[in-house]
């Protein structure tokens, strides 16, 4: 069987990694839909653990912005501190150690800052980026919308958490499917995305 074309954006557990970006205490009351974003990212993390997809976690200037919020469920992950508005410099060694890596699944904040710059850095390295749109946000919905449009223009894939989860598991016969089915039985919480995609002037058309 011919290999999948990179432009298709297929996601497979053996060639993917989940990035969790800067979901920290000081952002809790400033980021639009923060509880919903963290809830979806936590769902992605649980699926990654079930399917043995590696996970990397960063914190932006934790001395000032605090630790990762506990509801993410990131116990056992070692957060990497950074000041750069991209995850890539902090994760360079991890990326270089995974020659089979093809796809990065990206969750976190803020869309117009660390998510955008991480996306551009990863695309520049020839990796596919799948922005989990219901697990990324900003303080401003305008910044969120424009950042999503910008990442799409640059070649990133915009995906929902459930779409990516079902791509990763691939088959209802998968031994972990019943556990994953429990996680997606309820739809992901509303994080204000529908309004961003509607209207004649939507940047995402």
UniProtKB/Swiss-Prot annotation:
The organism named in the record is Pongo abelii
Q: What protein family does this chain belong to?
A: Belongs to the isochorismatase family.
Question: For this UniProt entry, what is the primary localization, expressed as one broad class?
Answer: cytoplasm
What keywords appear on the UniProt entry?
Cytoplasm, Nucleus, Phosphoprotein
**Could you tell me where this protein is found in the cell?**
Cytoplasm; Nucleus
Q: Which residues cross the membrane?
A: none
What name appears for this protein in its UniProt entry? Isochorismatase domain-containing protein 2
The cross-references to SUPFAM superfamilies, in alphabetical order and at most eight, read: Isochorismatase-like hydrolases
Subunit details: Interacts with CDKN2A.
A cellular component annotation (GO) from this entry = nucleus
Modified residues annotated as Phosphoserine in this record:
7, 202
- Residue spans making up a coiled coil are none
Q: Which InterPro entries does this entry report, sorted A to Z?
A: Isochorismatase-like_dom, Isochorismatase-like_sf, Isochorismatase_domain
């Amino acid at each position: 069987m011919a290999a999948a074309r990179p432009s298709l954006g297929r996601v497979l557990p053996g060639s993917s990694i989940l990035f969790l970006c800067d979901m920290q205490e000081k952002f809790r009351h400033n980021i639009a839909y923060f509880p919903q974003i963290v809830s979806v990212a936590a769902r992605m993390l649980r699926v990654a653990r079930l399917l043995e997809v590696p996970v990397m976690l960063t914190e932006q200037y934790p001395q000032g912005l605090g630790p990762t919020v506990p509801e993410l469920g990131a116990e056992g992950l070692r957060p990497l501190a950074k000041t750069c508005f991209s995850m890539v410099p902090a994760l360079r060694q991890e990326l270089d150690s995974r020659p089979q890596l093809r796809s990065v699944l990206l969750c976190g904040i803020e869309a117009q800052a660390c998510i955008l710059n991480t996306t551009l850095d990863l695309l520049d390295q020839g990796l596919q980026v799948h922005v989990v749109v219901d697990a990324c946000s900003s303080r401003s919905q305008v910044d969120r919308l424009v950042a999503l449009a910008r990442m799409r223009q640059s070649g990133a894939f915009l995906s929902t958490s459930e779409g990516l989860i079902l791509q990763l598991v691939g088959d209802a016969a998968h031994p972990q499917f019943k556990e994953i089915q429990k996680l997606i039985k309820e739809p992901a919480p509303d994080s204000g995305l529908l309004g961003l995609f509607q209207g004649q002037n939507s940047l995402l058309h």
